[in-house]
């Protein structure tokens, strides 16, 4: 451990020495119409040929020598903004980008995309915009995020009628799927034909297929990171749509103009409503709700409360019913310690429920997983050549393997509860993104995590502590 600390010290020492003679420009980049912060906006200093990108909350920071510079900010679907700025001291500068109304001509993708990827140490990462997803062919007129990422290289379908995906040979349960930092355990609606993500409420999608940053843990194949919209803090808007399978409605607007906002987006299928008009008592439907509240306390502090709730229900003749779905909530606090140090504190709750009712036998069965997660992440812009990402994470797991209860007094089922399992998973990480020369950049990091089983458990032992032996003649122990 001391050896690693020494290596890190000598690698970062030049950055600290040279950064003393420089100043920093930092700020937030947002949409002019809605004040929605924009993720992944390119901020480029033309005179120095250096630049950076906004983080998950629209924040950027660049350290550079004193002088006059032309700052270019660009983002797909928005007009590029160019502004000349004199920088003689640390400056906070926010930018607002206007959505581009110009109709784009046919775009031909060339090898330049690979050249751009080589320039960044972040490899095997794909980013999709919501507009791109909505332009793709849709099943029964329903846009689908999971189906869209199947078009990316290295991503395949988990199977017919399933909404999961495999990345480079990994299993579907080896993918970490996050919605506003909260874990989504089941991404499917309606037997896998649709995913649980309402694209009307989504702001940013990023898929890590390799070189996964050390701030993520718990999975080995990939990370699908999804962020919801914050809501329009300027004006009230509503939009929706009616499809063959489901309908949707979104409402967003200011709580306090230019300071706080809300967003509510709901979807529901309605095929089961028509089945009630016939003698058919079968039913299959889903619904979900996305919510988000955002509030700007001051220039250095922001609060976010986001949530998702979804359910799928399938029943046959009122004698069989299957119910499952996700529930997640996240309370976040963004704090800017300085123009170089950004932090985010998150309190996260994730829940997956699975229920089964068999009235002809007379029992209810339910199981599920609950997580309580505390995260504290920091992003430190040490210099124009070095960025540090570090933080801690603590997860409390509550596993319910199964609980069975009789549905009526004539049922022959006795109530029973399989022993619940509990665990605690703390972790800490550090990531370094460093530009060594104009042609060489590296990204390296380390993550430390532990998994603790909690609570009592019944352990069976053999009489007299005799060792277990195997009899090959009778194939018994």
Language-model features: where?
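Outer-membrane beta-barrel translocator domains and adjoining extracellular loop/strand segments
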Residues: 275-280, 307-310, 314-322, 355-363, ...
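Extracellular loop and loop/strand-boundary signature of outer-membrane beta-barrel proteins
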Residues: 235-237, 274-280, 314-320, 328-332, ...
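N-terminal secretion/transport leader regions
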Residues: 26, 30, 38-46, 72-76, ...
């Amino acid at each position: 451990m001391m050896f690693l600390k020494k290596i890190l010290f000598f690698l970062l020492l030049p950055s600290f020495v040279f950064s003393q003679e420089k100043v920093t420009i930092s700020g937030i980049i947002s949409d002019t119409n809605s004040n929605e912060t924009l993720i992944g906006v390119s901020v480029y200093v033309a005179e120095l040929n250096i630049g950076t990108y906004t983080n998950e909350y629209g924040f950027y920071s660049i350290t550079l020598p004193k002088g006059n510079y032309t700052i270019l900010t660009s983002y797909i679907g928005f007009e590029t903004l160019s502004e000349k700025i004199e920088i003689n001291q640390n400056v906070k500068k926010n930018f607002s980008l206007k959505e581009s109304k110009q109709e784009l001509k046919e775009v031909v993708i060339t090898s330049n995309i690979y050249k751009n990827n080589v320039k960044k140490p972040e490899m095997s990462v794909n980013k999709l915009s919501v507009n791109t997803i909505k332009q793709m062919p849709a099943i029964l007129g329903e846009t689908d995020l999971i189906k869209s990422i199947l078009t990316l290289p290295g991503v395949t379908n988990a199977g017919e009628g399933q909404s999961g995906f495999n990345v480079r040979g990994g299993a579907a349960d080896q993918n970490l799927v996050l919605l506003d930092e909260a874990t989504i355990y089941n991404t499917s609606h309606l037997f896998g034909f649709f995913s649980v993500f309402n694209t009307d409420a989504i702001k940013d999608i990023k898929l890590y297929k390799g070189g996964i940053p050390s701030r993520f843990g718990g999975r080995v194949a990939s990370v699908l990171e999804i962020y919801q919209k914050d809501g329009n803090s300027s004006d009230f808007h509503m939009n929706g749509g009616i499809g063959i399978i489901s309908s949707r409605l979104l409402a967003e607007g200011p709580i306090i103009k230019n300071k706080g906002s809300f967003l509510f987006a709901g979807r529901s299928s309605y095929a089961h409503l028509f089945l009630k008009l016939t003698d058919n008592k079968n039913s299959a439907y889903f619904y979900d709700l996305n919510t988000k509240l955002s509030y700007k306390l001051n220039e250095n502090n922001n609060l976010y409360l986001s949530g998702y709730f979804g359910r799928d229900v399938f029943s046959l003749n009122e004698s069989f019913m299957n119910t499952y779905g996700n529930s997640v909530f996240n309370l976040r606090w963004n704090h800017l310690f300085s123009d170089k140090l950004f932090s985010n504190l998150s309190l996260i709750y994730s829940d997956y429920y699975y229920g089964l009712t068999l009235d002809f036998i007379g029992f209810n069965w339910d199981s599920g997983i609950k997580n309580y997660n505390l995260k504290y992440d920091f992003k430190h812009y040490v210099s124009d050549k070095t960025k540090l990402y570090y933080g801690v994470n603590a997860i409390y797991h509550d596993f319910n393997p199964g609980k069975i209860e009789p549905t009526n007094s004539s049922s022959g089922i006795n109530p029973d509860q399989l022993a619940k399992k509990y665990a605690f998973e703390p972790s800490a990480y550090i990531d370094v993104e460093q530009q060594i020369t104009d042609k060489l950049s590296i990204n390296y990091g380390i993550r430390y995590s532990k998994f603790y089983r909690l609570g009592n458990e019944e352990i069976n032992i053999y009489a007299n502590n005799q060792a277990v032996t195997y009899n090959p003649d009778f194939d018994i122990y």
